[in-house]
């Protein structure tokens, strides 16, 4: 596996490899912030399976962190990440520093930032964007830069960050980016907990409790799938189905609900009801919940999850 730290190295590699194969080969790309786990591995394995070359980037992107968020404490596990990537037969790791990606610097205060940035208006302000107002501006900007550097045929993203995928799909479509996006299913443990780099902050007991996030979403999905033809469930009925599962953990202060959403898959517009008809468009039930660690009550971890129907 080749490890590159500059744009010039990636461009030179890409030009040389494709020239030798007369541009008949494909490049798959998996952008990450490191601290890789089995969820990332599933994306990478899919790329290796489907493409001639696979490029993975590891870059902890400052522009998607707010001044109140602790960029310095984001987990960085590069030596372990490299071992995993080598075992997965990745061709190139691109691991730039912040100066490479943001030549004018990247202060966390948006008012002090200079240079070009990408905003996807209308989608970025919803759900995650309410809690993290400039998060998707940072994501869209860094992904645009990475797409321009790698020039991959296809890029792989996990369903767990579904709003990110929807925002980036809009960006790719409307900025005419020549990279296809592919969303891969959420990787879960045996009891349904979505794998996340944040899980490592929780003790085993709190991780076990967190498995109820998926139980709540799954209960809502089952209620929808049981609808008879022409049947209808209101928004409140669906969301109540979710929160009833979580109620004991809210009462015990293990969970603090940020949001539960019932939305159109493409627009993320909130739905008033769901009807079992052929005209019903795909929907996404998503959530964000703050989980307080039982061993270290000062540790609060925000977990997200979703189900697409």
Swiss-Prot record:
Keyword Transport: no
A Pfam entry, by short name: Pantoate_ligase
Entry's localization field: Cytoplasm; Nucleus
Pathway entry: Cofactor biosynthesis; (R)-pantothenate biosynthesis; (R)-pantothenate from (R)-pantoate and beta-alanine: step 1/1
Membrane-crossing segments per the record: none
UniProt EC number: 6.3.2.1
Keywords assigned by UniProt, alphabetized: ATP-binding, Cytoplasm, Ligase, Nucleotide-binding, Nucleus, Pantothenate biosynthesis
Keyword Chaperone: no
Enzyme class: ligase
Disulfide bonds: none
Misc remark: Present with 2400 molecules/cell in log phase SD medium.
Entry similarity comment: Belongs to the pantothenate synthetase family.
Full protein name: Pantoate--beta-alanine ligase
């Amino acid at each position: 596996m080749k490890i590159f730290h500059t744009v010039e190295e990636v461009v030179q590699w890409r030009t040389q490899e494709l020239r030798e194969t007369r541009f008949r080969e494909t490049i798959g790309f998996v952008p990450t912030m490191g601290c890789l786990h089995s969820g990332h591995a599933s994306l990478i394995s899919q790329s290796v399976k489907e493409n001639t070359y696979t490029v993975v980037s590891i870059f902890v992107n400052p522009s998607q962190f707010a001044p109140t968020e602790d960029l310095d404490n984001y987990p960085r596990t590069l030596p372990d990440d490299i071992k995993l990537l080598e075992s997965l037969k990745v061709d190139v790791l691109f691991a730039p520093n912040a100066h490479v990606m943001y030549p004018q610097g990247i202060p966390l205060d948006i008012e002090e930032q200079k240079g070009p940035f990408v905003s996807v208006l209308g989608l970025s302000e919803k759900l995650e964007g309410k809690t993290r107002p400039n998060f998707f501006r940072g994501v869209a900007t860094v992904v645009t830069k990475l797409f321009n550097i790698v020039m991959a045929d296809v890029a792989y993203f996990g369903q767990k960050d579904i709003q990110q995928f929807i925002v980036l799909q809009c960006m790719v479509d409307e900025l005419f980016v020549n990279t296809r996006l592919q969303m891969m299913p959420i990787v879960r443990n045996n009891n349904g907990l979505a794998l996340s780099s944040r899980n490592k902050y929780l003790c085993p007991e709190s991780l076990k409790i967190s498995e109820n996030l998926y139980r709540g979403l799954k209960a809502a999905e089952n209620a929808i799938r049981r609808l008879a033809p022409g049947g209808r469930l209101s928004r409140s009925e669906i969301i109540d189905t979710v929160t009833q599962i979580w109620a004991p953990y809210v009462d015990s202060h293990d969970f603090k609900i940020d949001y539960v959403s019932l939305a159109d898959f493409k627009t993320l517009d909130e739905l008033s009801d769901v009807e079992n008809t052929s005209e019903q468009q795909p929907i996404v039930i998503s959530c964000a919940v703050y989980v307080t660690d039982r061993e270290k009550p000062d540790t609060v971890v925000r977990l997200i999850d979703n189900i697409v129907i």
